[in-house]
């Protein structure tokens, strides 16, 4: 009663209440999972990991080859190099410096041991109800800053992609369901990767039904273009929709249609679109992997400047929104912007 009284000062918007009720119905109904597939996937992964660990011990002679400190020492002794780090960004450099087949093989094994192919399968087994359905997979207003739906338990909003053909996927699924590791290894090279691709197939509809999955295409780029009324971008989305190519052409004053897939300029357009649409700068480019993509440090700031110059309406929107937020805080009164 006391909680209700406190919350009464903050009434739920009329349009939000039906959404919340709908969310509750979805969570109460739950989603079916193939527990047989999940169980066998976990078992197969355990066998693969045990094999890799034995191979690592045999190759290195280490008691615990999963220990970063022990492995760094082994690489230094084997290849005669100094190893500062074995994090993801450093591995390519370590391989190049070592130039050693044994080190390459051990780093491959280490990558295999670190794969988390079955974490979501384990989560399914932990959270499934007796009827084989998982409930509570989404949380209404779960994200702290944005208020969007948040994934819970198995985190369905972040599932590995299926990259193999449907026929191969079906074959792999049948073999995993049967626990047939021997045939699986005959047909597929990367067992851990195959298990990852099968995660989506572990969610199953009721008999006679199908799951229809859809996603928004370049949703962040579309929304910011619409909010800011960046005309050239909206024209791109009205027509061919190739925003990476169009962005590169706009930024570097290239003829329309001149940038194609595989063009280095498209790569610059892509990283700029991914990192810079919402006020990001050099730090955002680095976080999105610009340096790993082959861009030089000296290219980053000019890339930021080029993108902002090509998108003046979006850049103006940022500063207008910033000024409105400051004004609202200072005056304690709402500030209306063109989009709301």
Regions found by a protein language model. Give the residues of each.
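Structured ligand/cofactor/substrate-binding pocket environments in proteins
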Residues: 188-189, 210-241
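Active-site-proximal segment of RNA-dependent polymerases
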Residues: 191-198, 202, 261-265
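Short, polar/flexible loop-turn hinges at active-site or ligand-entry regions and domain interfaces
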Residues: 6-12, 231-237, 254-259
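Conserved "right-hand" nucleotidyltransferase catalytic core of DNA-directed polymerases
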Residues: 1-195, 210, 217-220, 249, ...
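Short, leucine-enriched amphipathic alpha-helices that occur as contiguous helical runs
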Residues: 16-19, 263-270
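Generic long, charged, amphipathic alpha-helical segments
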Residues: 239, 243-264
């Amino acid at each position: 009663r006391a909680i209700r009284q406190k919350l009464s000062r903050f009434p739920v918007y009329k349009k939000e209440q039906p959404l919340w009720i709908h969310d509750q119905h979805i969570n109460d109904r739950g989603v079916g999972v193939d527990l047989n597939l999940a169980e066998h996937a976990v078992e197969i992964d355990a066998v693969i990991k045990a094999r890799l660990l034995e191979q690592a011990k045999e190759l290195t002679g280490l008691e615990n080859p999963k220990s970063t400190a022990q492995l760094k020492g082994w690489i230094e002794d084997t290849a005669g190099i100094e190893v500062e780090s074995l994090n993801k960004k450093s591995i390519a450099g370590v391989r190049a410096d070592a130039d050693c087949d044994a080190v390459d093989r051990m780093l491959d094994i280490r990558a295999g041991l670190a794969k988390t192919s079955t974490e979501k399968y384990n989560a399914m087994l932990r959270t499934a109800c007796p009827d084989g359905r998982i409930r509570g997979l989404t949380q209404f207003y779960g994200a702290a800053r944005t208020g969007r739906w948040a994934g819970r338990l198995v985190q369905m909003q972040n599932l590995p992609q299926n990259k193999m053909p449907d026929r191969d996927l079906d074959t792999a699924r049948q073999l995993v369901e049967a626990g047939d590791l021997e045939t699986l290894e005959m047909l597929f090279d990367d067992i851990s990767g195959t298990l990852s691709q099968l995660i989506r197939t572990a969610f199953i509809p009721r008999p006679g039904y199908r799951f229809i999955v859809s996603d928004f295409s370049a949703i962040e780029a579309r929304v910011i273009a619409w909010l800011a009324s960046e005309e050239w971008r909206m024209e791109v989305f009205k027509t061919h929709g190739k925003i990476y190519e169009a962005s590169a052409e706009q930024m570097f004053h290239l003829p329309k249609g001149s940038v194609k897939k595989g063009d280095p300029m498209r790569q610059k357009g892509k990283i700029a679109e991914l990192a810079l649409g919402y006020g990001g700068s050099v730090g955002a480019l680095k976080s999105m992997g610009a340096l790993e993509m082959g861009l030089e440090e000296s290219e980053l700031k000019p890339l930021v400047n080029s993108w902002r110059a090509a998108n003046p309406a979006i850049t103006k929107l940022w500063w207008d929104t910033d000024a409105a937020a400051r004004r609202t805080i200072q005056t304690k009164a709402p500030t209306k912007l063109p989009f709301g």
